[in-house]
Amino acid sequence: VRFPRPYDNVDGIMTNVPGITLVTYHADCLPVYLYDPAHQAIALLHAGWRGTVDNIVSAGLEKMRKAYGTRASDVIAGIGPGISAACYETSEAVRILFAETFTDRDMERIFTEPHLGEDGARHWQLDLALANHLLLQNAGVQEISDGGICTYRNAKRLFSHRAQGAKR
C-alpha cells in the first residue's frame, strides 16, 4: 500500500499509527531507529555524516516529543547496518565540521588513524555508528543497540556506495 507523500528529500519519518510500515533506504549511511513504547511511536532516521553533524538524532527525538509526548529516556534506539570506521575514510574538512557538534574527547573516539590520503592530504577513519551512539546518549536515550554490521564488508548482501559505486 502506498500513500501520497507531502514531502521530498527528508532524512527522517515517523508515525504512531499501528499497522503503518515505514521504510528508508541506506547505502553506507546509518539507519537509526527510535521506538517509544510509552506512546507506540517510531521514527526512522537516515544518518550520514551530514545528518550526524546536524544531529538528526536530536531533531528526530524533538519531533517525536512535540508530536507524541516522547521522552528520550523512554526511547529504545537501534543503529542498523552502515559503513564501519575501518572502511570509512574521511577528509580533514569533514572532521572540522564534526568538531562543531562533538566535544574534543568524543572527537578522539570518533576519528582515528590520521594518515595521508592518496591526494596527499590528511585523512581520518570516521566511526559514524559511535558518533550517533554518543548523540543518542547525550540526548538522554539509555537503551541503544548497534548490530555492528558493515555495509562495505558485506557488499554482497547489502548495498555499499563505497564498495559498489553508483550501481544498485
Annotate the PLM regions.
Residues 1-168:
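Active-site microenvironment for binding and transforming phosphate-containing groups
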